[in-house]
């Protein structure tokens, strides 16, 4: 990916763990617009760029001995969503990738924007089951746009509210809680099915 997009790897960071691989990126924003986490406003539509859970499924397939699949490629060699980022740069009010899990990453947007949300679980397409919304490594985008600029070309999963709470809504009876990867905390897991944040 670094060669494809002519990005030299430089930088540093610190984290608890036996192996550290760090990436720092410097650059000029497209159209001088930076999509941040803190711009969501009451009434904005919450969207995602793709179904959730492909990387989780890819990991499961890889561990089961399957050699190649689209899901495995999405897990082992995720592609940055530069074209989508460019296409929403003029209309999105906030944006984040879903590498830590859709719900936990969306919560970053809501917390930083000091807003809440109604999330329509029935609208979220998943690869395996509804727990995919907590699976990480998808590297797709979750973003907010003003309702009057939504044209139906992205997956609409909710709406921003001003009450600073998150309401998960499902007519199908889905019952989930917000989980996902938390940086700088010890995370014990063997497979995605028994991921626990301690």
What would you call each of these model-derived segments?
Residues 15-18, 38-41, 65, 86-89, ...:
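Solvent-exposed alpha-helices and their adjacent loops that cap or buttress functional pockets
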Residues 26-28, 142-146:
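Short hydrophobic/aromatic beta-strand micro-patches
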Residues 76-79, 151-198:
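Acidic, Ser/Thr/Pro-rich beta/coil linker or hinge segments at domain junctions
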């Amino acid at each position: 990916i670094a060669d494809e997009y002519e990005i030299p790897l430089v930088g540093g960071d610190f984290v608890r763990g036996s192996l550290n691989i760090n990436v720092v990126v410097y650059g000029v924003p497209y159209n001088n617009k930076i999509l941040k986490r803190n711009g969501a406003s009451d009434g904005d539509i919450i969207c995602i760029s793709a179904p959730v859970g492909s990387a989780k499924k890819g990991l499961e397939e890889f561990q089961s001995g399957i050699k190649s699949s689209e899901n495995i490629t999405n897990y082992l060699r995720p592609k940055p969503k530069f074209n989508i980022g460019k296409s929403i740069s003029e209309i999105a009010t906030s944006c984040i990738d879903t590498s830590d899990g859709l719900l936990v990453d969306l919560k970053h947007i809501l917390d930083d924007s000091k807003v809440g949300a109604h999330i329509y679980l029935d609208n979220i397409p998943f690869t395996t089951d509804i727990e995919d919304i907590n699976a990480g490594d998808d590297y797709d985008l979750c973003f907010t746009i003003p309702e009057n600029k939504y044209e139906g070309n992205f997956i609409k999963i909710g709406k921003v509210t001003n009450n600073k709470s998150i309401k998960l809504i499902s007519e199908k009876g889905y019952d989930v809680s917000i989980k996902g990867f938390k940086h700088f905390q010890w995370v014990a897991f063997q497979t995605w099915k028994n991921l626990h944040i301690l």
